[in-house]
């Protein structure tokens, strides 16, 4: 890396890319100062994209010096019509409020999309491929993979091996909770992985009772136990006494940048409107029991209309019911016609309904199978046939 930095002509390869750069008017570019300059990979990024007419806002995270000439050295790498704003250095102690004030002072007139005009009821499934799920934009402004790994009932080396296998197979969404008792092991697996932290979206949940009564401690305990710098989304596990108090506490951690998005688990129509009226940040996601035998059509439509993403736990029906669902004749016949498994049909059905799914598994082969649902599509008739299986049959008490 030092050799690359010493060569101004060096252009390290970038493993990923920004989709549809034309959709952005303003681009923030952050980097550490390296020998008084921006890392050469920033040059690669600037030369790989068209910044014509865009506003570019540089910032750095140097611990010693200011941004200096590191940003002006980059100006020649973009078109003359690109507008460069003055850069700023942030220290390691900078918090969200300092960054927010800086952005306000820039007077950029950034128009953020609202939940009213953001459609979260369907996904761009054509952009996915086996081993790489597409993402959905949350109302918090963060992108989240639409297919992941649930870790309920997985513990010790089993959960560590499951998370490792999932990450190796391309899964980038991991769900856990305080009540699962496996946050520590999941954090260890993520830290041991070669996958960059920013590519992994991690859920956890705090539980009614003591955690809702003292939410600040519960939230900090989750951050400390996972030990992965920040939590992508924290959910309230289900309604209970002090749930508004707990949610408002999470909002404070969002302001500090330690939690990125907030959601709810096991919330329904009769509860959501009253709850939203008492908080400041609208939930980005609701995680409920949803599967072919309990389809929650009204709830899904209602939450989607609020701009809230829906996520299914128990996508295969849950404990004691998975076998029956996977052997369901309707589902099995559809699976046979596509040359895929019944589990893959069920997951594809969720995704085509605009519902994120987090199937749990400790079997690496099943984990790979579950992330491989982007090379076939269910017909309208097949979607209708599965919709007809709805029995309003809830398999858990939430």
Q: For the regions a protein language model found, what residue spans apply to each?
A:
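Solvent-exposed loop/turn segments at secondary-structure junctions
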Residues: 33-37, 62-66, 90-95, 154, ...
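Short helix-capping segments at alpha-helix termini
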Residues: 49-52, 78-81, 192-199, 226-228, ...
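Beta/alpha (TIM)-barrel catalytic core signal, keyed to glycine-rich beta->alpha loops juxtaposed to Asp/Glu
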Residues: 125, 134, 238-398
């Amino acid at each position: 890396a030092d050799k690359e930095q010493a060569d101004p002509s060096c252009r390290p390869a970038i493993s990923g890319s920004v989709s549809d750069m034309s959709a952005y008017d303003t681009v923030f570019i952050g980097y550490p100062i390296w020998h008084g300059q921006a890392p050469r990979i920033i040059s690669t990024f600037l030369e790989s994209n068209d910044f014509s007419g865009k506003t570019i806002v540089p910032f750095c995270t140097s611990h010693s010096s200011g941004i200096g000439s590191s940003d002006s050295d980059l100006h020649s790498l973009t078109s003359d019509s690109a507008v460069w704003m003055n850069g700023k250095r942030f220290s390691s102690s900078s918090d969200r409020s300092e960054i927010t004030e800086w952005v306000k002072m820039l007077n950029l007139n950034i128009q953020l999309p609202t939940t009213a005009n953001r459609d979260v009821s369907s996904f761009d499934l054509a952009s996915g491929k086996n081993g790489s799920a597409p993402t959905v934009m949350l109302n918090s402004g963060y992108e989240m993979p639409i297919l992941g790994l649930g870790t309920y009932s997985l513990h010790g080396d089993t959960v560590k091996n499951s998370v490792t296998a999932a990450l190796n197979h391309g899964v980038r969404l991991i769900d856990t909770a305080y009540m699962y008792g496996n946050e520590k092991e999941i954090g260890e697996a993520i830290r041991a992985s070669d996958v960059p932290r920013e590519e992994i979206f991690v859920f956890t949940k705090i539980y009614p009772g003591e955690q809702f009564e003292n939410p600040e401690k519960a939230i900090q305990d989750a951050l400390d136990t996972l030990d992965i710098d920040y939590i992508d989304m924290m959910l309230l596990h289900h309604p209970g006494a002090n749930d508004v108090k707990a949610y408002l506490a999470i909002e404070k951690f969002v302001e500090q940048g330690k939690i990125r998005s907030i959601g709810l688990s096991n919330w329904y129509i009769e509860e959501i409107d009253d709850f939203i009226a008492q908080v400041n940040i609208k939930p980005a996601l609701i995680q409920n029991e949803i599967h072919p035998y309990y389809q929650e059509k009204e709830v899904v439509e209602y939450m989607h209309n609020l701009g809230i993403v829906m996520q299914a736990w128990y996508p295969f029906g849950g404990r004691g019911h998975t076998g029956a669902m996977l052997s369901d004749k309707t589902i099995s016949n559809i699976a046979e016609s596509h040359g895929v498994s019944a589990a893959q049909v069920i997951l594809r059905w969720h995704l085509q309904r605009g519902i994120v799914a987090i199937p749990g598994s400790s079997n690496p082969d099943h984990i790979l199978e579950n992330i491989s649902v982007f090379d076939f599509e269910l017909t309208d008739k097949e979607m209708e046939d599965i919709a007809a299986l709805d029995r309003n049959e809830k398999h858990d008490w939430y």
